[in-house]
Amino acid sequence: MRHKHGYRKLGRTSSHRKALLKNLAIALIEHNKIETGIYKAKELRSYIEKLTTVARVGDFNAHRHVFAYLQNKEATHKLVTEIAPKYAQRNGGYTRIQRTTFRIGDASTLATIEFV
């Protein structure tokens, strides 16, 4: 039984899931808005909001913490210096998820996730 399980497995191994969330987070930081499956978007929201909360501090340790998750210098720099300072007075809720359409091939629900 999977009652009260803390996260979605997304049909992937733990390493594949970790790489997927990292790549989606980098894409969201670079483009400010991406379209993906609804459940991937919901998992990404949790992942990116935790990173944004840490990045709001803006010091050297925040850079290190964010880089440890993203492993991408440009995305880390953009998150800590450009995106996170916008949310200095906001307590969570940095992203918005909107259902958009259904994918043609398998009719799965798609959604856009963007920074507010």
UniProtKB/Swiss-Prot annotation:
GO terms for molecular function: structural constituent of ribosome. Signal peptide: none annotated. Keywords: Ribonucleoprotein, Ribosomal protein. GO terms for cellular component: cytosolic large ribosomal subunit. Gene3D superfamilies: Ribosomal protein L17 (3.90.1030.10). GO terms for biological process: translation. Disulfide bonds: none annotated. HAMAP family: Ribosomal_bL17. Belongs to the bacterial ribosomal protein bL17 family. Part of the 50S ribosomal subunit. Contacts protein L32. This is Large ribosomal subunit protein bL17. It comes from Helicobacter acinonychis (strain Sheeba).
